[in-house]
């Protein structure tokens, strides 16, 4: 059926593959929330695949007038026919801005990046 054949691919080991570095319950919750945002915002993009990835590094930021060292989420949205090569999906600035605001509202996240790297040299997934 089309709903299965045309669905966005998702890795077998689930959300753990969207976390670079140690996988903990807290980090799983962050990537789970970010994934829900990305999927809702990009479901009509007609992209081959889109995802939120939690990096192993942290970034300095400011929240409520206090300095914080927060998590970094990368949003990746790509177009492909066969998954052997892929190009970056051009997403309107206002949508990227909304995604960034929503993701940085997740507790502990203060940075949201959009990955502009095609395949090759990158792969579709991070891990």
Where do the protein language model's features map onto the residues?
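ATP/NTP-dependent adenylation/nucleotidyl-transfer catalytic domains that generate, transfer
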Residues: 1-127
């Amino acid at each position: 059926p089309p709903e299965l054949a045309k669905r966005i691919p998702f890795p077998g080991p689930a959300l753990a593959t969207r976390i670079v570095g140690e996988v903990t319950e807290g980090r799983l919750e962050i990537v789970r929330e970010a994934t829900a945002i990305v999927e809702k915002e990009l479901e009509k993009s007609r992209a081959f695949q889109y995802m939120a990835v939690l990096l192993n590094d942290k970034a300095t930021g400011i929240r409520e007038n206090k300095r914080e060292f927060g998590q970094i989420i990368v949003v990746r949205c790509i177009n492909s026919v066969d998954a052997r090569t892929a190009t970056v999906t051009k997403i309107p600035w206002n949508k990227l801005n909304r995604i960034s605001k929503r993701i940085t509202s997740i507790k502990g996240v203060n940075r949201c990046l959009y990955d502009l790297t095609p395949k090759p040299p990158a792969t579709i997934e991070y891990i």
